[in-house]
Amino acid sequence: MTGEKSVARIAGVNIPTNKRVLIALQYIHGIGQKNAADILEKVKIPLDRRVNQLSDAEVLQIREVIDRDYLVEGDLRRETGMNIKRLMDLGCYRGLRHRRGLPVRGQRTHTNARTRKGPAKAIAGKKK
């Protein structure tokens, strides 16, 4: 390969060309280290190969495996949102917690949970 190769685009994401393929695939929402290693194993690409060393055929193979076997990016975000919306429509406990913006998985809220609840609200006349 001579010169700088154009940016590889997989699942609608620009993959960085100077990184190892194992790391670069993790820029796609829904693909972590395990899935990236599994994809490269299916396509028979070494884990230490860099993106700019990939041929167009190899990039196409990776793209096909991801499209066929994995739920990524917009589809994954849509499905996650639909699952949360379904819980809220059911009116179950988890749905109510989502609706109220509180922790869903049983964490305490007396103290902590500031990230989920938002900034602390000042109470008038509450001074020692």
Swiss-Prot record:
GO biological process: translation
GO cellular component, one term: small ribosomal subunit
Keyword terms: Ribonucleoprotein, Ribosomal protein, RNA-binding, rRNA-binding, tRNA-binding
One Pfam family here: Ribosomal_S13
Single GO term (MF): structural constituent of ribosome
Stored InterPro entries: Rbsml_uS13_C, Ribosomal_uS13, Ribosomal_uS13-like_H2TH, Ribosomal_uS13_bac-type, Ribosomal_uS13_CS
Region (Disordered) residue spans: 105-128
Membership in a protein family: Belongs to the universal ribosomal protein uS13 family.
PANTHER family: 30S RIBOSOMAL PROTEIN S13/40S RIBOSOMAL PROTEIN S18, SMALL RIBOSOMAL SUBUNIT PROTEIN US13M
Its biological purpose: Located at the top of the head of the 30S subunit, it contacts several helices of the 16S rRNA. In the 70S ribosome it contacts the 23S rRNA (bridge B1a) and protein L5 of the 50S subunit (bridge B1b), connecting the 2 subunits; these bridges are implicated in subunit movement. Contacts the tRNAs in the A and P-sites.
UniProt subunit comment: Part of the 30S ribosomal subunit. Forms a loose heterodimer with protein S19. Forms two bridges to the 50S subunit in the 70S ribosome.
Name this protein carries in UniProt: Small ribosomal subunit protein uS13
Protein species of origin: Rhodopseudomonas palustris (strain ATCC BAA-98 / CGA009)
